[in-house]
Amino acid sequence: MKYQQLENLESGWKWKYLVKKHREGELITRYIEASAAQEAVDVLLSLENEPVLVNGWIDKHMNPELVNRMKQTIRARRKRHFNAEHQHTRKKSIDLEFIVWQRLAGLAQRRGKTLSETIVQLIEDAENKEKYANKMSSLKLDLQALLGKE
């Protein structure tokens, strides 16, 4: 495993994930009966400051259909948490207008690259174009100077 699991921290993430899903109207318990489900949710809500007990609640009450989705969410959150510790792995965000993002995403898809790789490629293309333009301008001036002397 690449990233260390931190039980207390991850239990808090699991609690937040389950509460968010409950508030969005998803069934987070394995119970069909509404009163049993509500009772289990009430117990979960009372465990906010008891991260160690959250795992027990999950084993006992959680809807089995949520298991894989929650694991994926926690794994992604763990990765972001550890990557945020280092400047070179930390994700940055930029504000793009939707139409700009849409065009960039389309270009990235056509080129078979990620958005970041596409942006780097566009920057390199612009830098190369600038170097080419400077070189051509310099050659043009040299040629004019050479022709002007004769």
Curated annotation (Swiss-Prot):
The biological processes this protein is annotated with in GO are:
cell division; regulation of DNA-templated transcription
Stored Pfam families: MatP, MatP_C
Asked if the Swiss-Prot or TrEMBL record annotates the protein with the keyword DNA-binding, the reply is yes
Any one of the GO CC terms: cytoplasm
Q: Where in the cell is it found?
A: Cytoplasm
> What InterPro entries would the database entry show?
Arc_rbn_hlx_hlx (IPR013321), MatP (IPR009390), MatP_C (IPR035375), MatP_N (IPR035087), MatP_N_sf (IPR038339)
Q: What keywords is this UniProt entry annotated with?
A: Cell cycle, Cell division, Cytoplasm, DNA-binding
Question: What coarse category fits the chief subcellular location reported for this protein?
Answer: cytoplasm
Query: Example GO molecular function term?
Result: sequence-specific DNA binding
Answer whether the UniProt record assigns the keyword Cell cycle to this protein.
Answer: yes
Its annotated function is as follows: Required for spatial organization of the terminus region of the chromosome (Ter macrodomain) during the cell cycle. Prevents early segregation of duplicated Ter macrodomains during cell division. Binds specifically to matS, which is a 13 bp signature motif repeated within the Ter macrodomain.
Family of the protein in this entry: Belongs to the MatP family.
Relate the assembly described in the record. Answer: Homodimer.
Q: Know the name of this protein?
A: Macrodomain Ter protein
Species annotation? Shigella boydii serotype 18 (strain CDC 3083-94 / BS512)
